[in-house]
Amino acid sequence: VELTPRQQGVLALQAVLPILHLGLEWYRGFHEVIIIPEPVTRRQEVQDEFGLVSEFEEENAGESWPQGPLVLAWSELQQDGDWDGFNLVIHELAHKLDMLGGDADGAPPLPRGMDPQQWTRALQGAFDEMNDQLTREEVTEIDPYAASHAAEFFAVCSESFFTDPLRLRAVYPAVYDQFARFYGQDPAARYPATRLLAGDPGAQG
């Protein structure tokens, strides 16, 4: 996908938002962002508690690996930019921050002065609460994909922190407080919303 200078700039602005007060060194370990036209479909295998293996196809709009590039689907990026709790760039870069601590597990290295126990207590409590809601077949305020894994909970809540901060603060105030300390920002204070990425039809696949 070939992007215009404006589109490149807008994506760069979104990418720098999470590390605005952390510093560029928090993006160490990767040096490339690959933009593909559409999400990638991969065949996955999952083993249940009885040892039975089943296959399914999973569509990935973005992917990130330790020391590897960031892969983002342009068709999905064009839908981002509103303050609606969804942002692919922030989601995948949150995984990159998470991986600085080793495996992606929702426990990135914390800035000096933060209490790891408070971090774990806040995120684990909210993660368990969301899973309990889904068990009761209730509608969640945050994207239920967050309940699939601790790493996804961190990434999805990071999306919400920056693009729907009032909702995250209302639903999971302890998580919002920890994120405000981690990212060194209070996005709820900069409401009202502003468009981060206006869909520009000028891109070429």
Question: Over which residues does each language-model region extend?
Answer:
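Extended cationic-aromatic binding surfaces that line active-site or macromolecule-binding grooves
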Residues: 1-42
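Metalloprotease/metallohydrolase-associated module, dominated by Zn2+-dependent proteases
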Residues: 13-21, 38-83, 100-205
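A structural signal for short, well-ordered beta-strand segments and their strand-loop junctions
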Residues: 29-35, 71, 97-99
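Short alpha-helix carrying the canonical HExxH Zn2+-binding catalytic motif
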Residues: 81-98
